[in-house]
């Protein structure tokens, strides 16, 4: 039995390692502007150089950019703490995602094939992805197996909410592919090193009300 104390929780998870490029810096950099011009000539809306830079165009035709900066789990945690926040624990994340459900998924023990699931376009569904909607707590959580969230328990980092897309990339299908978004899924073989993988690792800030009242 676990007690989940009152929390203030970030609605959507945040990406790691990427730092926004200012509009002015983007305009002044000739190399980046040449990359944008080349992309536009080819009808592309995004340019990605792995773990270096990402330039992307939004629906209003405006170009934005972000730079990749390698960081560690410990640096991320310290930065979060410096701003008065915390990372959720595994049990806290499970409750935020499942509300204490006794089933594999918050909606039951199997995949609902009427859902529109990301990375499963062969299901021939249109419109908004089902799991990208707010849950019972008003959170977007456990929506994409490629996006695993970093949690922290007494000196130990681990992941919840995804496996980095390993099951889907391995061709295991929709049920096994989406099993990692289950509140209770835990990959015991997943090794956690020192550095964060900015393409797959995300985080969510929380504030523990009891901690702030002491």
Regions found by a protein language model. Give the residues of each.
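Extended beta-strand/loop cores of jelly-roll/beta-sandwich
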Residues: 1-91, 193-214
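Extended aliphatic helical segments
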Residues: 3, 9, 141, 151, ...
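Proline-rich intrinsically disordered, low-complexity coils
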Residues: 6, 20, 145, 180-183
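Glycine-rich loops and low-complexity Gly/Arg-rich segments
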Residues: 32-37, 111-114, 173-177
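Intrinsically disordered, low-complexity regulatory segments enriched
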Residues: 37, 98, 181-183
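Functional-site microenvironments in short loops/helix caps that host divalent-cation chemistry
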Residues: 54-171
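Short, solvent-exposed cationic patches
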Residues: 164-185
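Short proline/glycine-enriched turn/loop segments at secondary-structure junctions
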Residues: 179, 186-197
């Amino acid at each position: 039995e676990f007690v989940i104390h009152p929390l203030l929780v970030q609605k959507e998870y945040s990406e790691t390692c990427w730092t926004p490029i200012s509009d002015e810096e983007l305009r002044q950099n000739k190399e980046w502007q040449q990359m944008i011009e080349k992309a536009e000539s080819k009808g592309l809306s995004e340019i990605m150089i792995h773990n270096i830079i990402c330039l992307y165009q939004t629906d209003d035709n405006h170009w934005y950019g972000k730079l990749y900066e390698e960081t560690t789990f410990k640096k991320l945690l310290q930065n979060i703490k410096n701003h008065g926040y915390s990372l959720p624990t595994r049990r806290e994340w499970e409750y935020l995602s499942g509300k204490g459900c006794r089933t594999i998924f918050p909606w039951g023990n199997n995949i609902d094939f009427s859902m529109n699931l990301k990375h499963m376009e062969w299901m021939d569904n249109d419109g908004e992805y089902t799991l990208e909607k707010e849950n019972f707590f008003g959170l977007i959580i456990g929506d994409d197996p490629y996006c695993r969230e970093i949690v922290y328990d007494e000196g130990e980092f681990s992941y919840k909410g995804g496996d980095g897309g390993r099951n889907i990339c391995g061709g295991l299908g929709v049920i096994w592919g989406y099993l990692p978004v289950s509140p209770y899924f835990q990959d015991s073989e997943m090794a956690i090193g020192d550095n964060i993988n900015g393409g797959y690792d995300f985080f969510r800030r929380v504030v523990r009300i009891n901690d702030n009242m002491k």
